[in-house]
Structure formats: structure tokens, C-alpha cells
């Protein structure tokens, strides 16, 4: 009787289980997922994942998985939530933060397109679908490995394009004298141009400090003072003395506070007392002009010789002078005429004008009075 040998496969099984007589078969792999987007089984999720373990998929992969396994290849936001919770129980127990991440990825990722609902806006919520250009964004259907997608080129906005200003084409704001577009076309990157070259050439000069008195005016004032001293030394009745003293109020000395008194229309007595020269009242001088330069009639009036002074005790003093015998009975000086309103005395020692002249002063006193008048 011949012995029979089992087949190689049965022999291998007999070695593993000799007593039972049953062969042990190799374990089979897990059945493929019923989903349509498996693509080889590499990217499919397990049937019964561990609820305590977070799935190893990104939020973009979860959204793409939910959309691909839907019947219409599109889902609303609430439909995506329901699919993720049903597929992965981990997200059902941990609802903190992941729903916001799903919304952000739908809005910011270019692979997802929003499709409005049919029938207007009566029902809330829009559909989300995949961009046909991003169908193969996962390598061989593996949701754990995502390909690097090349983003399509998009032209920059109008205000960033070269050759255009910040406020319009051609840099229109640059010609208005403000911070406009520079040579590179980007107005906000160019250095500000607050002043154009044409404006700088035609700009107004800056205010300068006032200049001091000209040197010529000082020389003329000094020459007039020397001439007045020489005329006073010649004699009190000399016609040149009155002309020189009255001529001190010319344009060179018209800016002084004390020499300007002579250009005003004062009573004859006050003028004669101030000058230290005696004599009868003379005709009042013409009113002063608003401009400082002299005219011909001014020079003729200044050069006219005054009348001869009275002798001592021959006649009563004129009404503006005081005699030693009756100092209290002298008439006060007449007020200045009101024909030139706005004119005021610039001399601070005006009350002493009537006391500066005395008929008993000698020649030296009059010379000293003239010097004190010039030094004021």
C-alpha cells in the first residue's frame, strides 16, 4: 500500500497545526473602503479608527475627502461638518476650534469654489466644490501627501502697476507740488517732493531784519551839529544860527526823538524859547508833509533871517518868555494847533521849553543851551 503525501500547501498547514488537522490560512488585508476616491487604498481612512486619536489628515484633506465622496460632488458647510463627524468620531468629542479651521480653509484655499444655491437667497448656505485644476492635488490619492500646486499668475492691482501714479495714470498728483509718484511709478515709495524746482526759483524772499541807520544819515547829523555850534559861537543875533537850528529837522535827523519837534507846527514863542533866540513872534511855519524829503519852500523858510532881538528892558517880553522880574505873571505857552491831528511831541522834556531862555543869559550860557539842545 503506497503512502500518500499531502500537497505543499497542505504540508505547510499540517506543520503549523498537526493535531487539529486544519490548515491555517494567511491573514487577508483589510477590505477596501466603500468610498469612491480611494485611488489604490493608500489614502483611505480606516473603518473603525480610534476615537481617542486624532486622524492624520489636514483640514484641506478632510474637506476634499468629504466633497469627493458626496453624491453630487459638492456639499454645504453643514454637510462637510456632518461627514467629518460621522467618519472620524474624534471630532465629535472635540469640537473646539476645528470648525473654524474648516471655514478658514474653505475661504482662503483656491482649490475650493463657492457655488451659489439655485433659486436665489431664500435658503442660507452655499455649496462648495473642488476646482477641476486641483483634482490631482494629492499624490496617487493619498490624502496624507499633498502636491505643491503652482499658483496661476495674477496681474497686480492698478495702483501697483509701473508707470502709473498713486492717484491716477501718469502720476497726475506729482505735478501738483505734493508728494506724487516718483520715477519708479509707485507714489508711496518715492521720496516726497514737497517743493518743485520751479517753485523754488520763483519763491518769495525770506524776511530780513531791519537795517540800522545809514552811515550817511549819521554823517549829516554830525555835520549839522557842528554847524549849529559854530553859528551859536558867532552870536545870538546871527541869521545863520536860526537857519542852522531850524534846519536840524531835515531828512537826516527826522528820525530822532528830539529833532522832530522842529518839524511840527508849534507856536512862535515856544519855538523861539526852545532855540534860545529872542525876538517878536514870527509867522507859523507851514504844516509838515508826510514825506521826509524837503522842498524848495522849506529851504527858503529856513534860510529867512529872524528879526533883530529886543534890547534889555526896551520892550515887554513876548507872550512865551519869562522875565526875571515877573516869573509868575508870564503867560503859559499856547497849545499846538489842531490842524495836524495825530502829531505828538516826541521830546520827553517839553515842559522845560519855556524855562530854557532868559534875556539875562550871557553868551556862554546860550552856547551851553545850544549844546544841551543838540545832546538831547
Swiss-Prot record:
GO terms for cellular component: chromatin; Flemming body; nucleoplasm; nucleus. Residues 304-321 have a biased composition (Pro residues). Keywords: Differentiation, Disease variant, DNA-binding, Isopeptide bond, Nucleus, Phosphoprotein, Premature ovarian failure, Transcription, Transcription regulation, Ubl conjugation. There is a cross-link at residue 25 (Glycyl lysine isopeptide (Lys-Gly) (interchain with G-Cter in SUMO)). Residues 35-44 have a biased composition (Gly residues). Changing residue 90 to S: In BPES; nuclear and cytoplasmic aggregation; impaired transactivation activity. Coiled coil: none annotated. In addition to its expression in the developing eyelid, it is transcribed very early in somatic cells of the developing gonad (before sex determination) and its expression persists in the follicular cells of the adult ovary. It holds the Pfam family Forkhead. Sumoylated with SUMO1; sumoylation is required for transcriptional repression activity. The keyword Phosphoprotein applies. This is Forkhead box protein L2. It comes from Homo sapiens (Human).
